Amino acid sequence: MTEQAITAAQMRAKDQFTINQIGIPSLVLMERASLAVRDAILTHYPAANKIVVVAGQGNNGGDGLAIARLLHVAGRGVAILTIGNSAHASSEHQTQAHICDYYQIPVASDPALLKDADLIIDAIFGIGIDRPVEGAYATVIKQVNAAHAPVVAVDVPSGINTDTGAVMGVAVKADLTVTFSYNKTGLVTDQGQAYAGRVIVADDMGTY
């Protein structure tokens, strides 16, 4: 397992090199990341069958949609709770949403969906957050934390600063975090560890 911890900027640079210089498409990296999260969920939460994926509109949310589809195909009960303005969705997110539509995976915008979940997947922000969480995002994060289900964070718990581990106003308190390619500097701080729970570094992502 890779021991090196890197910053958000370093991770973005590695992603961009892989996509632009090597030529591995972003959607391929997204699929590999999502497969790693799926595998972790099937290993650590094999009985989960009322899974709610909380997905933002960026590529972390796109990961979440791909994870929802992979869990659905694996026979798990899964629904998607969307947050944010879909008009601002990344192109990869839009592609994943189209695929989820094909599989008829339930999609909702009402956080009441969290009440009956037996597992929650946090795919709101990932490594990208650089300002305090506010508004509807803060509300949903608080509702995730108030739910009785365990939480798996995708890459970094939403609301945690990737570089420092600081809580950006409010943050998801995860039981398990699957982070991609390398650990992140914020996740090895005391506060980052407290919010990330157990950290799995999925280091076979094809990112160079």
From Swiss-Prot:
Task: Please name the GO terms that the record assigns under molecular function.
Answer: metal ion binding; NAD(P)HX epimerase activity; nucleotide binding
Among its keywords, does the record have Transcription? Answer: no
Question: Which EC numbers does the record give?
Answer: 5.1.99.6
Residues bound to K(+) = 60, 122, 158
Its cofactor is:
K(+)
- Give all residue intervals belonging to the YjeF N-terminal domain: 11-208
Cofactor binding summary note: Binds 1 potassium ion per subunit.
Enzymatic reactions: (6R)-NADHX = (6S)-NADHX; (6R)-NADPHX = (6S)-NADPHX
Domain of life according to the entry = Bacteria
Its name, as the record gives it, is NAD(P)H-hydrate epimerase
Q: What PANTHER family does this protein map onto?
A: NAD(P)H-HYDRATE EPIMERASE (PTHR13232:SF10)
Q: What is the lineage of its organism?
A: Bacteria, Bacillati, Bacillota, Bacilli, Lactobacillales
Which Pfam families does the record cross-reference, listed alphabetically?
YjeF_N
- Explain the purpose of this protein: Catalyzes the epimerization of the S- and R-forms of NAD(P)HX, a damaged form of NAD(P)H that is a result of enzymatic or heat-dependent hydration. This is a prerequisite for the S-specific NAD(P)H-hydrate dehydratase to allow the repair of both epimers of NAD(P)HX.
What keywords are assigned to this protein?
Isomerase, Metal-binding, NAD, NADP, Nucleotide-binding, Potassium
SUPFAM superfamilies (UniProt xref)? YjeF N-terminal domain-like
Q: Which family does it belong to?
A: Belongs to the NnrE/AIBP family.
Q: Which amino acid positions bind (6S)-NADPHX, per UniProt? A: 59-63, 126-132, 137, 155
